């Protein structure tokens, strides 16, 4: 094999947000969960991971860059995925470049990987899930694996449990499985993103800082010390999974919202039941929950669902665009930006919803009237600056390959651009 060539693949995967939570493993090595879970993949136009994987004979070791900074690949998560994919590699022939890589050659070759998240990393927005899913998807394409996305999800699971659900768009279920080797613990798509395209999702980024207790550590502590987690896994989640599947199939928003809110609250109750207790949500998170609960109760039926993963950021799911505009009005009233904040950077993603809200700048936000449900109890002080920014998005597609023009690595050297 000539030393000068570089072969690259670039892919993009969505982040996913749980509506029935995964928390706790029965096998730490294989990353096998103690219960099924369901997530929604979000529109990668707004929230995604892009990853380029390259191979070249002269690469001396596997290297990875995340958001422009080199990180260690010595940890078990990436190495286990690499081993699994290398073992399944097939012959590759690139007629244009005159390159042939035999199956046995992949064991000797090293990879350069560059990954970029267009959202806060390690802040409760499932960044590791999207990153591992994109890594596995791109590497599998480069090594010409024949496995479908369901089979690839079992490999991605070895790196990050939630990653297996980012290999599909729309609504995705991670089956806990029963086999000791984890062969039946895979992701399946319940419905694609077009099935329920009325939904609009608003994410309140309360904090982009890295959380104090990682999900891995938190799960281990909960499984060791919480009595509630065992009751949840055995008695509560199996029923909720069936109910949530039914709600998604029928597009039954009131049931969907009640289940999502209840499961989020119970997940964080498990965190509080852990010793020492884990605090992923904060005072601002509580205020957002209160805002949604008051509105839902005043109308008599859920207009918005809320859910929080392992972090303070609120994921709010509105039943349609009209409700999403009313939601954003409420959020901007309660959580306005600092006076020197550019409104264009305060609401990102699908900014067209701002037109429905009637907001063009911070002065418009300052003049928003209080929501009717709090007219008799208007807060004396607004929570200026408690939310860093809002992201407006929707359910989205699964992973895709991107053209070489979108690559994060130099096609001549295989190093970051």
From Swiss-Prot:
Q: Which family does it belong to?
A: Belongs to the diphosphomevalonate decarboxylase family.
Principal place of residence: other
Tell me the Gene3D superfamilies matching this sequence.
3.30.230.10, GHMP kinase, C-terminal domain (3.30.70.890)
What GO cellular component term, any one, is given? peroxisome
What SUPFAM superfamilies does the record point to?
GHMP Kinase, C-terminal domain (SSF55060), Ribosomal protein S5 domain 2-like (SSF54211)
| Keywords, ordered alphabetically | ATP-binding, Isoprene biosynthesis, Lipid biosynthesis, Lipid metabolism, Lyase, Nucleotide-binding, Peroxisome, Steroid biosynthesis, Steroid metabolism, Sterol biosynthesis, Sterol metabolism
Amino acids binding (R)-5-diphosphomevalonate: 22-25, 77, 160-165, 216
State the Pfam families in the record. MDD_C, MVD-like_N
Top enzyme class, one word, equals lyase
* InterPro entries in alphabetical order: GHMP_kinase_C_sf, Mev_decarb, Mev_diP_decarb, MVD-like_N, Mvd1_C, Ribosomal_Su5_D2-typ_SF, Ribsml_uS5_D2-typ_fold_subgr
Localisation: Peroxisome
Name the reaction it catalyses.
(R)-5-diphosphomevalonate + ATP = isopentenyl diphosphate + ADP + phosphate + CO2
Q: Which domain of life is it from?
A: Eukaryota
Q: How does it assemble?
A: Homodimer.
Q: Which GO terms describe its molecular function?
A: ATP binding; diphosphomevalonate decarboxylase activity
Q: Which GO terms of type biological process are on file?
A: isopentenyl diphosphate biosynthetic process, mevalonate pathway; sterol biosynthetic process
Q: What protein does this entry describe? A: Diphosphomevalonate decarboxylase 1
Return the motif ranges for Peroxisomal targeting signal PTS2: 39-47
């Amino acid at each position: 094999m000539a030393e000068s060539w570089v072969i690259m693949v670039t892919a993009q995967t969505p982040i996913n947000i749980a509506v029935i939570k995964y928390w706790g493993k029965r096998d730490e090595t294989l990353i096998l969960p103690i219960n099924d879970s369901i997530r929604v993949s979000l529109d990668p136009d707004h929230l995604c991971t892009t990853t380029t994987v390259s191979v070249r004979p002269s690469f001396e070791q596997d290297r990875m860059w995340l958001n422009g900074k080199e990180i260690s690949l010595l940890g078990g998560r990436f190495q286990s995925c690499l081993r699994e994919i290398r073992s399944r590699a097939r012959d590759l022939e690139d007629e244009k470049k005159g390159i042939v890589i035999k199956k046995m050659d992949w064991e000797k070759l090293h990879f350069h990987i560059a990954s970029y998240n267009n959202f806060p990393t390690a802040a409760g927005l499932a960044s590791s899930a999207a990153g591992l899913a994109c890594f596995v998807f791109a590497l599998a394409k480069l090594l010409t694996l024949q496995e479908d996305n369901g089979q690839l999800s079992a490999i991605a699971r070895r790196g990050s449990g939630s990653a297996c659900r980012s290999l599909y768009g729309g609504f995705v279920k991670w089956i806990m499985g029963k086999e000791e080797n984890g062969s039946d613990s895979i992701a399946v798509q319940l419905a694609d993103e077009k099935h329920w395209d009325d939904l609009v999702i608003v994410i309140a980024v309360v904090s982009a800082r890295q959380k104090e207790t990682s999900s891995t550590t938190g799960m281990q502590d909960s499984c060791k010390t919480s009595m509630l987690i065992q009751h949840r896994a055995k008695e509560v989640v199996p029923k909720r999974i069936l109910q949530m599947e039914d709600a998604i199939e029928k597009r039954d928003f009131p049931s969907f919202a009640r289940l999502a809110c209840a499961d989020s609250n119970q997940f964080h109750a498990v965190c509080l039941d852990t010793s020492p207790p884990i605090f992923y949500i904060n005072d601002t998170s509580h205020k957002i929950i209160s805002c949604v609960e008051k509105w839902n109760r005043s109308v008599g039926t859920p207009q918005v669902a809320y859910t929080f993963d392992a972090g303070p950021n609120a994921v709010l799911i509105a039943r349609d665009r009209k409700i999403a505009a009313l939601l954003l009005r409420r959020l901007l009233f309660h959580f306005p930006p600092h006076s020197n904040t550019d409104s264009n950077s305060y609401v990102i993603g699908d900014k067209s919803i701002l037109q429905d809200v009637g907001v063009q700048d911070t002065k418009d936000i300052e003049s928003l009237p209080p929501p009717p449900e709090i007219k008799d109890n208007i807060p004396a002080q607004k929570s200026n600056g408690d939310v860093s920014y809002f992201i407006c998005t929707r359910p989205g597609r699964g992973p895709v390959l991107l053209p070489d023009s979108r690559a994060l690595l130099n096609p001549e050297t295989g190093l970051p651009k």
